């Protein structure tokens, strides 16, 4: 029985996941892991965000675990930048607190409280010039 090919990093798995979900044209969610990193990610072809707007091609990330030896070295910021490139119109990050919350706000994310899901969402919206801005 042939072995399933293992993709060596969460970043490459993310690219493959988003490209595959976009090609299928339906929403998907999964958990990715490699070398101790874990990420829950979702792709939605269409998603209304309360008090912000309606978006196409949304990437949402949550429940991220970074191994201790890689923390405070910029891995998460780089991962957010990668996900922003993969998203068509919006990138959503769920439940960020402390220094991470402050960093996202400095990067232009807008904080939205989702009462239905009882969580904080941080939304970065792409403009036609492919930059992130506040709505």
Predicted regions mapped to residue ranges:
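Conserved N-terminal entry element of GNAT/NAT acetyltransferase domains
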Residues: 1-17, 130-134
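A short, internal acetyl-CoA/4′-phosphopantetheine-binding micro-motif in the GNAT/acyltransferase core
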Residues: 62-71
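Conserved acetyl-CoA-binding loop-helix of GNAT-fold acetyltransferases
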Residues: 72-85
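Conserved short alpha-helix immediately C-terminal to the canonical SAM/SAH-binding motif I
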Residues: 79, 99-103
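Conserved active-site tyrosine of GNAT-family acetyltransferases
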Residues: 103-109
């Amino acid at each position: 029985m042939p072995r399933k090919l293992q993709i060596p990093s969460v970043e490459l798995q993310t690219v493959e996941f988003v490209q595959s979900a976009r090609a299928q044209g339906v929403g998907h969610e999964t958990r990715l892991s490699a070398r101790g990193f874990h990420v829950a990610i979702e792709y939605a072809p269409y998603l209304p965000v309360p008090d912000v707007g309606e978006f196409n091609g949304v990437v949402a990330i949550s429940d991220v675990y970074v191994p201790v030896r890689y923390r405070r070295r910029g891995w998460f910021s780089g991962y957010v930048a990668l996900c922003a490139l993969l998203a068509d119109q919006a990138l959503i990050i769920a439940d960020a607190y402390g220094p991470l919350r402050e960093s996202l706000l400095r990067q232009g994310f807008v904080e939205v409280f989702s009462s239905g899901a009882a969580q904080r969402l941080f939304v970065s919206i792409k403009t036609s010039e492919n930059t992130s801005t506040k709505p």
